């Protein structure tokens, strides 16, 4: 099974300039493809996030969308009464996010930053963070730094929702931890156990399970983790 529609594969086949640098890769994708052609760009917010809010397990607060892309989920969350900051490595994606926020007449702050780099300007700023299909873009050697940065951005007892591709997902060849996509990017597919080990030093785990999530062309198997920052 391949997660990309045949017409989309034709579009990306002619792309050039995608290298090993994630910022360059993402800027190229957002420059060269329409939003309709970008596989992770979905307009409707994910059910797991909607359910968390509609059940009132999460109330409006200061929130950060990690790897916000073109801003769909950040703008939706702002419309639900949250004070939202969207962070992404791609300045091209954030240009689109700002346009969307203006079109929807909501305020979001958008910040260009490497989430494995310097996030001091965002320290102790948020009560809720989420990353949706972001962590599988990071290899194991960078994940500890990333999670430490997320914790640094959050206030004590803040909540954190992370959803990334599971090693049980049949897409992109269907096996192996590292899998190449038609875009030229490489993704890392996780197990529940390794995510438990990743998050436990800094977070209490509320929920950890494998779920099916909506994709643009086919569904995916993903690991959902809902966490609370430990109070040290």
Model-found features: residue ranges?
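Short catalytic micro-motifs in class I SAM-dependent methyltransferases
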Residues: 133-137
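Conserved S-adenosyl-L-methionine
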Residues: 67
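A conserved beta-strand element that flanks and buttresses the S-adenosyl-L-methionine
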Residues: 130
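Class I (Rossmann-like) S-adenosyl-L-methionine-dependent methyltransferase catalytic domain
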Residues: 1-62, 70-122, 138-149, 159-232
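Short, conserved loop/helix-junction motifs that constitute active-site signature segments
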Residues: 152
């Amino acid at each position: 099974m391949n997660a990309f529609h045949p017409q989309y594969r034709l579009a990306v086949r002619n792309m050039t300039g995608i290298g090993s640098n994630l910022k360059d890769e993402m800027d190229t994708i957002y420059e060269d493809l329409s939003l309709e052609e970008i596989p992770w760009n979905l307009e409707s917010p994910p059910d797991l996030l909607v359910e968390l809010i509609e059940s009132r397990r999460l109330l409006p607060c200061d929130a950060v969308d990690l790897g916000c892309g073109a801003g769909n989920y950040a703008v939706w969350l702002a419309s639900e009464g949250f004070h939202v900051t969207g962070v992404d490595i791609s300045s091209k994606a954030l240009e689109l996010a700002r346009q969307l926020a203006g079109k929807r007449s909501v305020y979001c702050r958008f910040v260009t930053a490497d989430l494995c780099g310097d996030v001091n300007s965002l320290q102790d700023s948020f009560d809720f963070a989420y990353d949706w299909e972001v962590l599988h873009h990071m290899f194991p050697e960078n994940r500890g730094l990333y999670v430490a940065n997320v914790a640094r951005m959050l206030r004590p007892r803040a909540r954190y929702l992370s959803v990334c591709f599971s090693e049980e997902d049949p897409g992109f060849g269907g096996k192996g931890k590292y899998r190449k996509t038609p875009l030229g990017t490489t993704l890392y597919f996780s197990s529940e156990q390794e995510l438990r080990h990743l998050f436990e030093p800094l977070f209490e785990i509320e929920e950890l399970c494998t779920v099916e999530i909506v994709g643009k062309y086919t569904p995916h198997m993903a690991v959902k983790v809902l966490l609370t920052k430990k109070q040290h």
